[in-house]
């Protein structure tokens, strides 16, 4: 009888965890800690740190434990994007500092791809990050042809406001 109960317990835990009932708790990192890290990483790639900071807010509201079925961490990186820029294990995506390093590295890679085709702009960079470079290319690099994001921060960036979130230094 105890074996049946133990098996049922394991089955229920597996079922609930796969349905998202048992989730990681939020791990919201204070803006005052995130901002210096974002500035440091953005500078490495010649990116506007306020744009990157807005992306962190848009993706996770600065939650290091943010997770969807396909993306992890503060910058909501997919495993494919992660592997495009680092050999580090994807399990590290929940470490907010590593996630910012890799996420900004991925933004830097996308910036390089846009520069190569002479199409760089911050709205295009955001669209590439959100929907993929290939999806933007299929639309002739016209952000206006991309699906309008539900997220208000992304909507502002797509419309040309590349600094829609107040930074701690503002």
Model features per residue range: what roles?
Residues 19-62, 89, 97-100, 115, ...:
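Export/targeting segments at the very N-terminus of extracytoplasmic proteins
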Residues 38, 42, 51, 55-86, ...:
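Cell-wall polysaccharide-cleaving catalytic domain and substrate-binding groove, primarily
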Residues 44-48, 68, 119-122:
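Extracellular/periplasmic catalytic domains that process cell-envelope and extracellular macromolecules
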Residues 79-138:
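Alpha-helical segment that forms one wall of the substrate-binding/catalytic cleft
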Residues 120-170:
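Catalytic and substrate-binding regions of cell-wall glycan-acting enzymes that process beta-1,4-linked
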Residues 1-7:
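Bacterial N-terminal signal peptides that target proteins for export
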Residues 12-19:
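Hydrophobic h-region of N-terminal signal peptides that target proteins for export
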């Amino acid at each position: 009888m105890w074996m049946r109960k133990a098996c049922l317990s394991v089955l229920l835990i597996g079922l609930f965890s796969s349905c998202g009932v048992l989730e990681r708790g939020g791990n919201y990192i204070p803006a005052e800690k995130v901002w210096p890290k974002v500035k440091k990483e953005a500078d490495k790639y010649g990116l506007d740190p306020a744009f990157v900071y807005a992306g962190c807010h848009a993706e996770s509201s600065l939650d290091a434990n943010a997770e969807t079925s396909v993306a992890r961490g503060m910058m909501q990186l997919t495993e494919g994007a992660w592997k495009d820029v680092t050999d580090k294990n994807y399990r590290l995506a929940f470490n907010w500092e590593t996630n910012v390093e890799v996420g900004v590295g991925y933004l830097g890679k996308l910036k390089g791809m846009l520069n190569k085709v002479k199409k760089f702009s911050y709205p295009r960079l955001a669209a590439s990050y959100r929907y993929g470079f290939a999806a933007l290319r299929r639309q002739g690099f016209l952000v206006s042809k991309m699906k309008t994001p539900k997220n208000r921060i992304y909507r502002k960036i797509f419309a040309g406001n590349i600094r829609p979130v107040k930074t701690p230094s503002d």
